[in-house]
Amino acid sequence: MYQPDFPTVPFRLGLYPVVDSVAWIERLLEAGVRTIQLRIKDKRDEEVEADVIAAIALGRRYDARLFINDYWRLAIKHRAYGVHLGQEDLETTDLKAIQAAGLRLGVSTHDDMEIDIALAAKPSYIALGHVFPTQTKQMPSAPQGLAQLARHIDRLADYPTVAIGGISVERAPAVLATGVGSIAVVSAITQAADWRAATAQLLDIAGVGDE
């Protein structure tokens, strides 16, 4: 049963781009995206704080669900909509501080054991990946594929879920057919020959999410 320790999110978050700059946040919110994540890696808090502030301000301007990847202290300080954490971050993050601040929490998973760990944290949503091979980041695990994704969805039937990893415009309908609530994309937009067209196509397929 979906009873998170953090504020709830809609079962369907819709198209969920994951991007590494405020410029991309602004472009995609202008294009109609309403769930988005700022993921800047391997920098100190003071190096990314200005970007976090700007991204959160944009999220508010567009009434969007803006998640900050990893930099949970800054997300709390500047009152982001939510935080997204990888498995490796769960043990070193003060989850109670995120909870007390009223921020939503998303957690990445790659297999059944990591789903167990995520469920124990009772986050707002669970991300399932990587579905297909991806060049966006080095992955220690093998792609899960659609059958494995569908099995996880059956297990998490009433939980908001997000599929991520190698999802393209062409693959998106089959991914959503598993019953997953949302799809996260990276290169399908940021490396597209025409990012506006790719975004519009993905919005047609996945929508903007439930209210």
Curated annotation (Swiss-Prot):
Cite the entry's keywords alphabetically: Magnesium, Metal-binding, Thiamine biosynthesis, Transferase
Q: Which reaction is catalysed here? A: 2-[(2R,5Z)-2-carboxy-4-methylthiazol-5(2H)-ylidene]ethyl phosphate + 4-amino-2-methyl-5-(diphosphooxymethyl)pyrimidine + 2 H(+) = thiamine phosphate + CO2 + diphosphate; 2-(2-carboxy-4-methylthiazol-5-yl)ethyl phosphate + 4-amino-2-methyl-5-(diphosphooxymethyl)pyrimidine + 2 H(+) = thiamine phosphate + CO2 + diphosphate; 4-methyl-5-(2-phosphooxyethyl)-thiazole + 4-amino-2-methyl-5-(diphosphooxymethyl)pyrimidine + H(+) = thiamine phosphate + diphosphate
A single Gene Ontology CC term: cytoplasm
Q: Which ranges of the sequence are coiled-coil?
A: none
Q: Name one GO biological process term.
A: thiamine biosynthetic process
Q: Which cofactor does it need?
A: Mg(2+)
Record: residues binding 4-amino-2-methyl-5-(diphosphooxymethyl)pyrimidine: 37-41, 69, 108, 137
Pathway-wise, it operates in: Cofactor biosynthesis; thiamine diphosphate biosynthesis; thiamine phosphate from 4-amino-2-methyl-5-diphosphomethylpyrimidine and 4-methyl-5-(2-phosphoethyl)-thiazole: step 1/1
Residues recorded as binding Mg(2+), renumbered to this chain, are 70, 89
EC number(s) from the headed UniProt entry: 2.5.1.3
Gene Ontology MF annotations: magnesium ion binding; thiamine-phosphate diphosphorylase activity
Indicate which residues the UniProt annotation says bind 2-[(2R,5Z)-2-carboxy-4-methylthiazol-5(2H)-ylidene]ethyl phosphate. 134-136, 166, 186-187
Record note on cofactor = Binds 1 Mg(2+) ion per subunit.
Q: Which HAMAP family match?
A: TMP_synthase
The family database entries (PANTHER family) matched by this protein are listed as: THIAMINE-PHOSPHATE PYROPHOSPHORYLASE, THIAMINE-PHOSPHATE SYNTHASE
Question: Its family?
Answer: Belongs to the thiamine-phosphate synthase family.
Q: What does the UniProt function comment say about this protein?
A: Condenses 4-methyl-5-(beta-hydroxyethyl)thiazole monophosphate (THZ-P) and 2-methyl-4-amino-5-hydroxymethyl pyrimidine pyrophosphate (HMP-PP) to form thiamine monophosphate (TMP).
What's this protein's name? Answer: Thiamine-phosphate synthase
